Amino acid sequence: MTATTSATLTDGREARLRPLRCGDRERIVAAFDRLSEESRYRRFFAPLHQLSDRSLEYLTDIDHSDHEAIIALDPGTDELIGVARYVRGEPHGDRAEAAVVVADDWQHVGLGRALLERLVARARAEGISRFTAIVQADNRRALELLAEIGPTSRSLEGNLVELDIELPDERVGTALAAALRAAAGSIFGVRPLSERLLRAAHELSETRRSGP
């Protein structure tokens, strides 16, 4: 679970992958600050200018079982350049919500694929057999490729599709890897996670407003 591995990307660059650690809080903040407005919107489905303390606690306080996060680091700068995470729907259940985000200048080179492969392996090791994910409805290539794997899907609010993905027993198959490459600029499974983050930020704001 703590091992660091390397991934060679399609443009020849290398990335280091490992599970998130408690000391990565500042890396999370810095990575968020570097995201473009479009990437932030796709990740959180709402304009978000900064992460609240409560949001950061949620993102970094993980148990590596019901909540897991795999991060990618730039070997040259040690900056965080990508995160894939799952959150189990209920303790020890066999389903989890999944999300992937990649730094703007590391998109479309296979980093999302590498992160997802590692995340699926961790999920399988923890007894998770299915991921739910959210993809924008106009991301046709990703939807078509994911459908080849056998997910059921339904439209949400007209422009979003929820996917139910059966995880492979071993490494992510070629079709799923290709789907992630096709959607490298999109985020899988962000809506449920983003709603929790935005709710936490709103609650924190209300608490401060009503305080002394």
Question: What are these model-predicted stretches?
Answer:
Residues 1-212:
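Long, contiguous binding/interaction regions
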